[in-house]
Amino acid sequence: MTRPSPVLATVARLPASAAVLVAAAALLVTPPAPAQESPQPSRADWLREARLGLFVHVLPASPSDLAKIDDFDVEALAAQVEAAGARYLVLTLGQNSGFFNAPNAAYDRRTGYRPGERCSRRDLPLALHGPLARRGLRLMLYLPCQAPNEDARAQEAFGLARGPRDQPIDARFARLWAEVIGEWSARYGDKVAGWWFDGGYARVRFDEEIAGIYAEAARRGNPAALVTFNPGVMLVRHTRAEDYTAGELNEPFSVVPSSRWVDGAQWHALTFLGSRWGARDTRYPVERWQEWLGKVVAGGGAVTLDVGPNWDEKAGPIGSLAEAQVAQLRALGAEGR
């Protein structure tokens, strides 16, 4: 039961005429409640303070690609993230191909793959954490909301329909997928500051129950970990379970925060610096990015920019970023600070 306020308790003891006067006075002096509130303190406070982060799509699509995870230069990438002025890095664990950047025994047991066959033997998130942490930078992880849609064997093993597209999911599937999520979360503990889950679409029947199952698994190792679930190209609070908005945007410049909060979730946008996701070029002059980032930061938001890691050993260290992108990011990092 809600405890009555002191003003209301006093009114209840007064004659009717006096009660009316007191109640009217209370309306004049009581400030209006904020339009959008969030629990304080919020798990997402550090994200607001970070302002700018980077995202890298590391998506091996074959055994030869997976072998390159052994050569991924984590020191080079961490140094570039720091030089860019970003405060965190989001790394993909995997996506559609069925190849993943870290070992996972739960996944291997469910699918029947041998260790190292689909999940790399090198634990890339663990390898990245050290160089990032020494620089005061945080690590976050990306994972789809369902088994890889280009691996029919995995789809069948998790009880999904086979086919190269996102399949309908339910709570039964979510509990199986949560075993995979939970193994990674338990291993990494507080080394992972948050999760960005892709494919939380209405068309695959993603719902609050599934979001809750995934959020619990993602926080198995770190109760303070942030989670969000991507509903598509939009910036909204999609579920009650999320701490910040997924905020996927293709053309971001017209989208700015009017408040730090979106229905109680931290305002956050994710878009790409290059011409497309994972590209290594630049698509806009740095001044346009500076203007937008300045507005976002002033409004209490945070921005994650996707950049392209190198996969050609002849072009430089595996996993390193293009100098053209790093140059833009240095200017943006200064703006974010």
Question: What is each model feature region?
Answer:
Residues 36-337:
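Mature catalytic domains of secreted/periplasmic carbohydrate-active enzymes
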Residues 1-12:
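N-terminal secretory signal peptides that target proteins for export/translocation
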Residues 7, 17-19, 40:
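Serine/proline-rich low-complexity intrinsically disordered segments, especially terminal tails, linkers
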